[in-house]
Structures are given as structure tokens and as C-alpha cells.
Amino acid sequence: MKIATTITAAVLALAVQPVLADAVSDSFLMMFKPLPTEAPSADNELTEAKINLGRMLYYENRLSKGEKLSCNSCHMLDKYGQDNLPFSPGHEGKVGGRSSPSTFNAAIHIAQFWDGRAPSVEEQAKGPVLNPGEMGMPSADFVVEVLKSIPGYVEAFKAAFPGEADPITYNNFGKAVGAFERKLVTPSRWDDYLKGNKEALTAEETKGFETFAKAGCVTCHNGPAVGGMMYQKLGLVKAWPELKDQGRFEATKVETDKFYFKVPSLRNISETGPYLHDGSVKTLEEMVSKMGEYQLGKSLTSEETASIVTFLKSLKGEIPADYIAKPKLPESGPNTPKA
């Protein structure tokens, strides 16, 4: 009788384990949402004319000093929206102190840039063009002068901003680029999984998600972008070695913002190294291990690290080739100025 009772208890325990595992998994999954098809804006209607204009402007070299750089120079759309360099070369080969984050899925983030200094992709688009270390244009007025001198852009701005007496403005430049970027989304098998298709991920990837979640990674990396929705201190539980960049503090001058950075999205993370704001971490395995040590206070085993990396690779989406295809750019006018 005692043996039978013991066997029955063991069988019941085994039966309950998958149920408990599913319950744990479901509780973590509630922290995520599938990617939307676009990131809508209350202040920037996404019309076809505006998106088409934004696509042209994204690839436009004439909005840089020397006419050699465009948004796509650092945020290459055929390479998941970045250039795989620690620092991107700007005007005359100058490099900044932070790596170029991906433009894919960026519009759904809480803010733009590593320090969050731009509240939207529309505002972000206006920054690099005038930065002397990036595209190097002398002023917003000069950018407008260039655009107004190109007949094709005169017509494109009229179509994108109908009813405006003076549609070619620097703010409208930002709105057009922003409209294009708001549909730069890369859904993956992870989204299918979140929508209920439990066959979308392999058993190893599902196990990797469980490891990722139970380790505590989901505290910061959650939501539709698997990150991008909060700021966090780099070196949260253990001081990050040789950290000089003061992060968000450099934008806000608020003492408590020192060493805080926008939490990066993990979408397409397997394709967007090197990692961190300074590109100092070369591999995904090293990044996961360091996050465990410095952000979570945990020494992840090699098996745990590998398991998490397996899950992260499932976040790789498909680049929308037709949407990002470089359009034919309008020809310069007879008096188009050069910076």
C-alpha cells in the first residue's frame, strides 16, 4: 500500500511539473507584446506621400557637408539599421563617443539616442544633419535652402504636407523621415509565439526564454521591442569597469541620471553588434555574461549563457526589402548649393 501511494505521488508530481512550468512561462509572457505593424503618432499622420518623401530623405547625401553621408551611412537598412562598428565615421572621418543604434523598431521606444535626449524619431532625425561630427550641415536654414532648390523635392513636400503655405521646413524634414521610420519594423518568430503559435519557437529557444526570464533579464527587457522602454544604470549591482560616459546625465544634468542609459531593444540583437553605447563588447555571449554579472549580480553558467543566446537569436526579424529599397532621388536644380 505504501509503495502504491509513493508511486501515485511521484506520477502526480511529474504531471504537475509541466503545468507549473507553463504557468511560470505565461506569467513572464504577459510582460511582452507582439510588434505593431507601425508606430503611430498623434502629431505625425503616416500618409503614403510623407513616407515616400521620408524614404528619399533617409538616403539623401546632399544633406551632408561634402555630399557623402546620409542617414543610411550609419544606419544601414540592409544591415538591420546600423553599421556593425563601435563608432560611426562622420564628416571628414570624425567619430563620436557612442555607437549608432538601429533605426528598426526604434519608433516604439520611450525616446531616442542612448541618453534619450530626443523624445521622438521626428526630433532625432533633425540632430545628426546639423552635428559637425556627423553630417555637418551649417544650419537648418541651409538644409531648407538645399531642398527648395531641388524641383523634385518641392513637389514631394507639397504632396506630403498638403495645404501648407510653406511645406519645406526643417520640422517637416524631421516629420517625413520620422514617418518613414515609424514603419521600420521587423517581426520575428517571437511575435508568432506571442500570438499563440507555440510551435513558432523550438524547444531550445523556449527553454532559453525561461532562462532569460528567470535570470531577471525581463525586468528591463520587456514590451514589444524587448527593451527600449526605460532607463537603467550601467553597472547596477556592480560598478561597470572603466565607465567614463555619464550617460543620460550629459543630456539632463540631473545627478541621479549619471551612468543611466536607455535600455536597448533586443530585437535583431544577434545582427547588431558590437554592443553597448561604446561598442566595447564584441560578442553576444560576452554581453549576456556581463549583464548577468554587472546588472543582475549573477554568475551565469556557460550553459545558461548559451541558452539565453539561443532565445535571443529568435528575435531576429525579416528586413522588409521592398519597403527599404533605395528610391530614385530627384536631380539637383541649377542653383542647388553645396555645403
Stretch-by-stretch model annotation:
Residues 7-9, 19:
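Cleavable N-terminal signal peptides
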Residues 10-13, 339:
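Short, linear, compositionally biased motifs with a strong N-terminal bias
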